[in-house]
């Protein structure tokens, strides 16, 4: 039975692409999409939405709207892509016209949610990217990577700042290297929730076989 207070985002293809350069066989993709549709997953993150690269990468590192339109997407889930925040900041600096080069307005896209992944220490640099995506009609999520080991004050001050922007719909924290234990998850959730009132999510890794219990703790 689905808990209506919890939304499940599946990022198997986006995260799994590190093993095959995001070059997935179409038959596998079709089977995967059918499976997640039957599993009551709420959101499917299809891949990255990256800037052009000089080396070969499969289509799911770009996950363009034209490419997505060729897929047989079930109607039930929402669909998402992820941006590597550092990539956009390093390559474009303050020029956010790059966002408009790779995103259409939401009304012309099958993507509903864009997640921006960025190191905890560089979160303040993500505001302009998120604001432009919001203006284009997308739901926008912040995925804080390398979020482990900060002080309660750091978490609270970060939550205050991003709440004040009004550009993020969801806040995620990632167990980037898989070393969080439940007490770490509890600390982060409690600290962020003091100043963040919108949905809060966790991206757990299973290095210590704690992904499930960490998710339940969150």
Q: Which ranges hold each PLM region?
A:
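Conserved N-terminal beta1-alpha1 strand-loop-helix module at the mouth
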Residues: 3-47, 52-57, 61-73
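Conserved C-terminal portion of the radical SAM core fold
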Residues: 156-176, 196
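Catalytic alpha/beta core domains of metabolic enzymes, predominantly
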Residues: 173-218
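N-terminal small/glycine-rich loop or linker at the start of catalytic domains
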Residues: 1-21, 75-78, 85, 109, ...
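Alpha-helical segments flanking ligand/cofactor-binding loops in enzyme cores
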Residues: 34, 131, 160, 190, ...
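A structural motif
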Residues: 41, 111, 167-168, 197
């Amino acid at each position: 039975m689905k808990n209506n207070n919890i939304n499940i985002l599946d990022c198997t293809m986006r995260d799994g692409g590190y093993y095959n350069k995001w070059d997935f066989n179409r038959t596998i993709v079709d089977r995967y999409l059918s499976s997640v549709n039957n599993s009551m997953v709420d959101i499917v993150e299809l891949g990255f939405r990256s800037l052009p690269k000089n080396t070969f990468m499969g289509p799911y590192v770009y996950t363009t709207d034209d490419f997505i339109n060729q897929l047989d997407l079930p109607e039930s889930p929402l669909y998402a892509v992820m941006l590597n925040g550092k990539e956009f900041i390093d390559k474009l600096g303050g020029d956010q016209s790059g966002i408009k080069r790779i995103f259409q307005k939401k009304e012309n896209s099958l993507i509903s949610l864009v997640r921006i992944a960025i190191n905890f220490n560089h979160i303040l640099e993500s505001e302009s990217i998120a604001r432009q995506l919001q203006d284009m009609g997308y739901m926008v999520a912040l995925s804080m990577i390398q979020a482990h080991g900060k002080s309660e004050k750091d978490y609270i001050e970060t939550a205050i700042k991003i709440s004040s922007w009004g550009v993020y719909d969801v806040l995620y924290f990632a167990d980037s290297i898989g070393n969080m234990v439940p007490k770490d998850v509890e600390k982060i959730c409690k600290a962020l929730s003091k100043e963040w009132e919108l949905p809060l999510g966790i991206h757990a890794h299973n290095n210590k076989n704690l992904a499930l219990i960490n998710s339940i703790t969150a």
